[in-house]
Amino acid sequence: MADDFKVVIVGGSVAGLSLAHCLERLGVSYVVLEKGSQIAPQLGASIGILPNGGRILDQLGIFRDVEDEIEPLNFAVIRYADGFSFRSQYPKALHSSYGYPVSFLERQKFIQILYDKLRGKNHVHTRKRVVSIVDGPGKALIRTDDGDEYDADMVVGADGVHSVVRSEIWRHAKEAAGTAVTEEEPNADIKYDYACVYGISVNVPHADTGVQLSSLSDGVSIHLFAGKGSKFFWFIMVRTSRDEFLELKKDSAHMARRTCEGLGSKRLSDAVYFRDVWSRCTVYQMTPLEEGVFRQWNRGRLVCIGDAIRKMAPNIGQGANMAIEDAAQLSNLIREMLASPRKASATTVEKMLRDFAAMQKARTKSMCGQSEFLVRMHANEGFGRRLLGRYLIPSLQDAPAGLAGLSIRGAVKLECAGVPSRTLGKAWEGSWGSSLRNLMYLRPRLGILSLVYVVAGLAMMYMSIYLVVPARLAAQAFDVSRDGTEGKGGG
């Protein structure tokens, strides 16, 4: 049955190539259509692999190649505008609890690893921009701008935030309803409050290996991660107005330089200023940051994964890892569907894709809520977030290290591959008991932890009533503060 089932993957980046690896494990036929001229272009970005993504990569036989390219993080130093700083052990705690280091490497290098490890490289095609998809009763038909056509039993949009597949899903839904798609409708739930500058620097003086440095101040957070071979990966989150957003779309290079030059005096540690990082920058980019969960993920034989269904700030470090989880979850459901002796019909495929969306949406909404809270807490946005970020979380000392692992609880794994030996005996079972065992070292600070619950609740009540923060976000606040210290900033 697997040989008769064909998947067309639109997009050849993290989500698309991860899915290709999963399908190879299942023996399912696939084609990857990438619109770019290269699979792994140098865009100046880094990527963070956390244990939930690392475990799936290990199941696919890829993680050791990733480990060869990284310098594992050991701890993070979080600095505030008033000069106060504290040290978080979250990277070491995650490594100990889940068996995988917090791993940072060049995004280009990671995508190249994914491509190089594929057996079926001949199934990956570049310069293939999809222009239309027809979802017929027997097959879906995909057309590209060079006139080529591909048929498929399923079409997966792994083509990012500006997904063509997602646009086609909306178009098909609206045509069926007899209405037109408005320009704003598909993106109605997406926020555009921040912009991100990211880059790579080399030989930054006084910046040690194995360390994350973060500087948090009003409206801006800067995060620096030591990589392998004297490389340092960094990103800046900056609050943007509508006018700045429009300017960024017109001239991102100029705005990136202006932003970075204006932050030169920001201290990342006693010895490292951002100007030290900027002066040794080799490549950088600036982009508006989308945040949120797209409303419709699937229709008929079409489905989206990765950034085509959700966008998160990089502070939480889960964007790529959730894309890898999507690939694994979708593969698990394909495997289950193809185990039936009957040929997969259009109805069967559509039901399977509905199940996929239902399974992933709960975790997605939780993770995106945490991400939205964290980026704003890092930027001192709002009384409650400022209280949590500047005073309560640092008072827990190393507590954020153990709390960080709670975001990994409930992570997906591949069902068609064995469990890696390095995860055995670790905190993967996803029970509250395992989470509590991770936090046992907090017993000396339980009084402080109780105070955090009380004060955080009061702070969230204040924000809900007086600052018109959505009740759902307020209710998640303490869960987010626990997870947030893992997310590239610790506080």
Swiss-Prot record:
Pathway assignment reads: Secondary metabolite biosynthesis
Location(s) in or outside the cell: Membrane
GO MF: FAD binding; monooxygenase activity
In terms of superkingdom, the source organism counts as Eukaryota
Q: How does it sit in the membrane?
A: Single-pass membrane protein
Q: Which cofactor does it need?
A: FAD
One GO cellular-component annotation of the UniProt record comes to: membrane
> Which major enzyme category is it?
oxidoreductase
Membrane spanning stretches:
448-468
Sequence positions that bind FAD: E34, G48, R107, D307, A320
Q: What is its EC number?
A: 1.-.-.-
UniProt keyword list? FAD, Flavoprotein, Membrane, Monooxygenase, Oxidoreductase, Transmembrane, Transmembrane helix
Q: Give the protein family.
A: Belongs to the paxM FAD-dependent monooxygenase family.
Q: What does this protein do?
A: FAD-dependent monooxygenase; part of the gene cluster that mediates the biosynthesis of paspalitrems, indole-diterpene (IDT) mycotoxins that are potent tremorgens in mammals. The geranylgeranyl diphosphate (GGPP) synthase idtG is proposed to catalyze the first step in IDT biosynthesis via catalysis of a series of iterative condensations of isopentenyl diphosphate (IPP) with dimethylallyl diphosphate (DMAPP), geranyl diphosphate (GPP), and farnesyl diphosphate (FPP), to form GGPP.
Q: What is this protein called?
A: FAD-dependent monooxygenase idtM
**What's the gene?**
idtM
